[in-house]
């Protein structure tokens, strides 16, 4: 029999079944009573009653178990299950039960119905396939009988990092309920199923059978027979293709107008492209565009960028993180998820600028100066060497930098008559040797620069340098300041002047003089610069009476050519006055008196052994030697 009231009961409810003997019995172990409950019979364990005539078995109704009039399975349904049932004397009890449905059977004594609705299967009307973000899948839950639904029950689905819910949409009053699941970004599973046997949730609603009994919501274990995973082969791909890196198959270097740079965009999965997506590139005042050319069906897409003349950048990168544009095309994965086109931040890791060192250079280099005659940037107009020549210059390039300089040498501005264009690598000076340059001829050095992108500067030519290998020609040199003199009375000073020196090329820049006691000598005064003066007064000398002194002069031109030395005919130091003679008062004889207003005098015997007598002077006084 049963102490449970007659009525209908559902899965999870407890029905107390009692077995009554004709005397008190002692029970050991766990007896079992097998009940007839449909496809799966319930085996109910002994609960209590030892020492009495009535034993109790608590039957908890299981999922899928049902019976229109609960009874045990057969007359042998009561089993010892390794236990014992004996009376006080130790006699084993007879376990044979009344025939099910007959007098004293459970079915005859009670009217207990096991009827609650339960889930028999979970499936989907969607075809076995892979589904993308935004796709809507109907999930069907099939009960063993019609059920009525209120509110919005739901099923929790196993969809990767974040589990999603399928929400009830229809089916109340039928045995099949439909739930709707919309694939969200990030959802992923290789075989869609619910999360657990308790994944079907009322969510404040109800699911009941026709009698109003709450349905059993327990589902088959995920992957087991009757589960969604076992019934269907549905793949969820909610992974959005994203850009992992931007680079280029073009070698690092500098490029200019007309060159093509191939930009590569790598995604985290294969993508399919339609149309012609584009990438906006940061290329200075005018931005460039790279257009899609190939790669559909793979992880890497290639874009061609044709460089325009207005484009310049020292490190090619795209314009911004949103520089990749569909341009009316599409970029999707195999199931149709639209790719996220966000690029790494410009200059950051995995950006084009970070991965590559590509310069776009359409700015020609600039040569700022060309100097002939020196390697240090100093420009000269003349030089005395006809076999060597130094050239120096300066240049710059604002974008890619100078790759090489070239120079040429000619007899005309920009000409190459002497040296055709020769590479100087990146040096900014060169020293030429082994030349055969012509005297009084002007030579012009020209320089041009090529940057790393191949842009060539304008040719810049120096102002020229003239070869001067001819010394100045000499003129004449005279002793004295006013015509040529042969004697001097000064013991400390000599004078000289010269004229007629010439240099037709670089011009005279300095005169030097020397003084010696022989022609061309310098024993009295060593060679001394007189700048451009053509007269000289030399003081602080110590001249010797009777010694002849010679002044020598030479000229130097701008490049250092020195003329021949030309020397005066000499000037003799006459430091001693003439030897005195005799002076007479009178013209013929020496007188003592005169009686007139005229005085006459005469002299004789005056001599000078060096320069000779030039003139006589006289004076008159009231006493000897006076001039009053």
Predicted regions and their residues:
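Extracellular fibronectin type III
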Residues: 454-467, 559-575
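Short S/T/G- and acidic-enriched coil/turn segments that sit immediately N-terminal to beta-strands
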Residues: 426-433, 532-539
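Solvent-exposed loop segments of extracellular immunoglobulin-like
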Residues: 401-405, 507-511, 612-616
């Amino acid at each position: 029999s049963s102490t449970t009231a007659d009525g209908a009961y559902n899965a999870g409810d407890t029905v107390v079944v009692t077995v009554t003997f004709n005397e008190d019995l002692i029970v050991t172990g766990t007896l079992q009573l097998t009940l007839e409950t449909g496809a799966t019979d319930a085996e109910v364990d002994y609960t209590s009653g030892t020492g009495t005539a009535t034993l109790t078995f608590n039957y908890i109704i299981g999922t899928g178990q049902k019976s229109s009039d609960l009874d045990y399975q057969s007359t042998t349904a009561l089993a010892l299950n390794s236990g014992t049932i004996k009376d006080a004397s130790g006699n084993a009890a007879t376990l044979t039960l009344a025939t099910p449905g007959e007098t004293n059977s459970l079915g005859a004594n009670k009217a207990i119905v096991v009827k609650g609705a339960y889930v028999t299967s979970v499936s989907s009307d969607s075809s076995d396939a892979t589904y993308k973000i935004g796709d809507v899948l109907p999930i069907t839950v099939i009960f063993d009988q019609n059920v009525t639904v209120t509110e919005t029950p739901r099923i929790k689905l196993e969809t990767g990092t974040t589990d999603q819910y399928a929400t009830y949409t229809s089916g109340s009053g039928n045995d099949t309920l439909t739930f709707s699941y919309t694939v969200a970004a990030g959802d992923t599973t290789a075989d869609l199923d619910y999360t657990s046997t308790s994944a079907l949730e009322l969510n404040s609603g109800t699911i009941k059978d026709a009698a109003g009994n709450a349905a059993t919501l327990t589902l088959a274990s995920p992957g087991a027979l009757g589960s969604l995973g076992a019934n269907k082969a549905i793949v969820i791909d909610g992974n959005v293709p994203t850009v992992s890196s931007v680079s280029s198959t073009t070698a690092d270097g500098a490029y200019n107008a007309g060159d093509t740079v191939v930009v590569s965009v790598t995604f985290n999965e294969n993508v399919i492209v339609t149309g012609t997506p584009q990438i906006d590139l940061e290329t200075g005042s005018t931005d460039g565009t790279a257009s899609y050319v190939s790669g559909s069906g793979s992880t890497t897409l290639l874009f061609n960028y044709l460089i325009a003349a207005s484009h310049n950048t020292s490190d090619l990168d795209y314009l911004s993180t949103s520089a990749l544009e569909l341009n009316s095309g599409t970029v999707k994965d195999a199931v149709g998820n639209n790719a996220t086109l966000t690029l790494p931040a410009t200059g950051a890791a995995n950006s084009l600028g970070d991965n590559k060192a590509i310069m776009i250079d359409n700015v020609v280099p600039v040569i700022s100066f060309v100097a002939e005659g020196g390697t240090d940037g100093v420009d000269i107009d003349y030089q005395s060497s006809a076999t060597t020549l130094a050239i120096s210059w300066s240049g710059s390039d604002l974008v890619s930098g100078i790759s090489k300089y070239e120079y040429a040498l000619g007899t005309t501005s920009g000409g190459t008559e002497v040296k055709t264009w020769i590479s100087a690598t990146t040096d900014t000076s060169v020293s030429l040797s082994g030349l055969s340059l012509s005297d009084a001829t002007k030579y012009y050095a020209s320089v041009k620069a090529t940057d790393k992108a191949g842009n060539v500067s304008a040719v810049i030519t120096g102002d020229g340098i003239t070869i001067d290998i001819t010394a100045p020609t000499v003129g004449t040199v005279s002793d004295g300041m006013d015509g040529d003199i042969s004697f001097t009375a000064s013991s400390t000073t000599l004078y000289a002047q010269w004229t007629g020196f010439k240099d037709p090329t670089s011009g005279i820049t300095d005169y030097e003089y020397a003084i010696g006691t022989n022609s061309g000598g310098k024993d009295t005064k060593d060679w001394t610069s007189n700048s451009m003066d053509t007269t000289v007064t030399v003081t602080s000398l110590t001249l010797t009476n009777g010694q002849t002194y010679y002044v020598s002069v030479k000229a130097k031109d701008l490049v250092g050519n020195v003329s021949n030395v030309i020397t005066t005919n000499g000037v003799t130091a006459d430091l001693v006055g003439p030897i005195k003679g005799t002076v007479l008062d009178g013209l013929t004889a020496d007188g003592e008196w005169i009686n007139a207003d005229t005085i006459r005098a005469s002299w004789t015997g005056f001599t000078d052994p060096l320069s000779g007598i030039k003139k006589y002077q006289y004076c008159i006084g009231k006493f000897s030697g006076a001039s009053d």
